[in-house]
Swiss-Prot record:
Cited function: F(1)F(0) ATP synthase produces ATP from ADP in the presence of a proton or sodium gradient. F-type ATPases consist of two structural domains, F(1) containing the extramembraneous catalytic core and F(0) containing the membrane proton channel, linked together by a central stalk and a peripheral stalk. During catalysis, ATP synthesis in the catalytic domain of F(1) is coupled via a rotary mechanism of the central stalk subunits to proton translocation. Component of the F(0) channel, it forms part of the peripheral stalk, linking F(1) to F(0). The b'-subunit is a diverged and duplicated form of b found in plants and photosynthetic bacteria.
Organism: Synechococcus sp. (strain RCC307)
Membrane topology label: Single-pass membrane protein
Origin superkingdom: Bacteria
Protein name as it appears in the record: ATP synthase subunit b'
A single GO cellular-component term on record: plasma membrane-derived thylakoid membrane
Amino acid sequence: MHSWLLLAEAATPKGGLFDLDATLPLMAVQVVVLTFVLNALFFRPVGKTVEDREGYISTSRAQAKEKLAQAERLEAELKAQLLDARKQSVAVIQKAEEEVDRLFREALAVAQSEANSVREKARGEVDAEKAKAFSGIDSQAEKLSSLIVDRLLAA
């Protein structure tokens, strides 16, 4: 091990740590070349991919906002249509109820008038039968009274 330390000391130039030889500019050139190579081979494709993803995300967000706005607009339209349909159905139901009520009243009026006419006809028939019965009773009463008078006079 001792020989390695001697070897390391022997390789060190006389200027020390800040000795200006060709190593420092060579390293600077290597860093610049490596930067250009990495820029061409790695940073540009990665940057392009990142930009593409950002573009995709921004277009996706814009499309999502448009779809959300469209969905909200459609929801508002459908709510308005539903409200209109409910109003129309209420109007139709009220109209139907009024029509049923009108038809019921008409049918009731017709039935009452028919019942009144049947009742009047029956009353007329009853009165005619009553008059006929009274006339029949009167004639029978006259016959009976004349028969009684004849028997009383004959007796």
